[in-house]
Amino acid sequence: MNATKKPGALAAWAVAVLMSALIATGVSAETAGDWPQFHLDAAHRGASDSGAPRSNETAWISQDIGAQEGSSVAIADGKVLVNCVENLVCLDQLSGEVLWNASFEARPDICQVWGASPAYSDGKVFLSALKTICLNASDGKLLWSYAHPTGKGAVDGGPAVEDGRVLTSDWDGHHYYCLDEETGNELWRFTVQGNAQSTPAISGSRVVLSGWEWGLGGRVYCLYLDNGTEIWNLSTENSPCGSAALSKDTAYLTTYNFEGDGDVLSVSLQNGSLLWKESIARTDCTPALVPGRIHVCGGTDGYSDKATYCLDA
């Protein structure tokens, strides 16, 4: 598969943090609010209750660590956790100094522009790659690893952690897996039509995930977290390339259209009915949710204008 290189050379090699407001006031980053997994939490709300820095003054820039394009950092317990293609690097949140560096087996046959984001929970760090791994957050030592039965590795979709469970994927193996957080034992697996590309979104007893196909329509699924039983599925005209964001009773997601505009979809979490659809530039963005509003980005270099949208939920 070919992928267009995403802009921003800095993101490919180093991590920069704007924290001047925290440092100047003496407030620790931990009390200001963590960001422990993709899009903040297992529901992918994507909006922090913390205040943003009041200026763009750079607090620190890490050394060249080979940071993965297309991956987000996780921030928890005073640490910044970074996917670096074949290494997971842990930085000190206040100084940017490397605390530890743990190697892992990256998927060799996929363009490295796409990378899964790590997740943190209860002193442990999780990452989906050729295998799904769990590390001790204190020193980076391996606690367990889970080899996907298909032999395939994750692409784009990282782990989601909730209620003692880790949800992970194997992309063109077409499966999502639910693992025990402490042992890595498989609890259940689910097969999707298309590639298992999303980071699963979890709200209460329900999980929303999707199947993506190049240039074709896709499908969104809702499962019970406890046992992986399907509750409903919804076919989409264009494929969902990103991940869903969940509110109390609604799932929001976007679609990517290679021939034109994509969409933002609002779907009932209860029964999978389409509540509304709004056309935007093609995107693999996961929506960010604040009360009453949805924020999404769209557009691709050379194909469509790039824009940020704010929609009424």
Which residue ranges define each predicted feature?
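Secretory targeting signatures
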Residues: 1-32, 308
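Intrinsic disorder/low-complexity segments enriched in polar/small residues
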Residues: 6-7, 31, 84, 94, ...
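Detector for intrinsically disordered, low-structure N-terminal pre-sequences
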Residues: 14-16, 26, 97, 191, ...
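Blade/loop signatures of beta-propeller domains
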Residues: 30-59
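Repeat-blade elements of multi-bladed beta-propeller folds
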Residues: 33-42, 66-88, 106-133, 146-177, ...
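A short beta-strand motif characteristic of beta-propeller blades
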Residues: 58-63, 97-108, 141-148, 185-190, ...
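Short loop/turn segments that connect beta-strands within beta-propeller blades
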Residues: 92-96, 136-140, 180-184, 224-228, ...
